[in-house]
Amino acid sequence: MNRFARFAASALALSLVPAMLMGCGKKETAASSDLDYIKQKGTLVVGITDFAPMDYQDADGSWIGFDADLAKAFAESLGVEVQFQTIEWDNKVMELDGKTIDVVWNGMTLTDEVTSSMACSNAYCNNAQVVILPADKAADYGTVDSLSGLRFAVESGSAGMAQAEEKGLMYTDVVDQATALLEVKSGTADAAIIDSLMAGAMVGEGTNYADLAIGPVLNAETGEQYGVGFRKGSDAAAALNEFFRQQWESGALQALAEQYGVQAALIEQK
């Protein structure tokens, strides 16, 4: 190699040093935790379904509800924007792990399956699974034992579906609980199994489903509780628990619950 070639090679090697150092610098600024990842990208992507009074759209198409409003406030506390993404409930863990969403915040029952596959917040609302029937037939089905032979609509992958299986009831799974109600209203299904919180807001006199009624509670003995789910191992769940505690202490959580009619189900945050 002549002197000029050696000089050119040396110059090229030196020119690569800053680029290599810059590459190392980028690795150092990578998110060190899930919470940092959310903050660095500047958005909290919330996985939801149409589920009043927790998550639903107003006349302008904006997402509102007890959970939706809490998610907005939590995102604001982190200094990020909130983005709502509708999901298929059966795919919630896959959506989290694939980072298409950051959190499932949608009146989610804290089952063993959920708590083993997600980093979950403390429980914040009590709930139960109830049967929804046409109002003119509700009196005929006052007990769980009387339900055999009915065709149920249930949300796929939901606690309602689990209750249908546990009780040996015939069912068809649908995309969400709102669709389950529509199936009963249209006569496609004899009954539905949905969350008691949704039933209280959506069914009966003064609602869009005045011709439907709430029937037996399927898990009255055990009940269930709602929690919020992040990716497995995420530190964002601990941050949300602290946010819940602060919101309880300030009274903001109780006021929001009263706004959406879920105050009786609210669990104290310590």
Residue ranges, per PLM feature:
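Periplasmic-binding protein-like
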Residues: 126-133, 196, 200, 204-245, ...
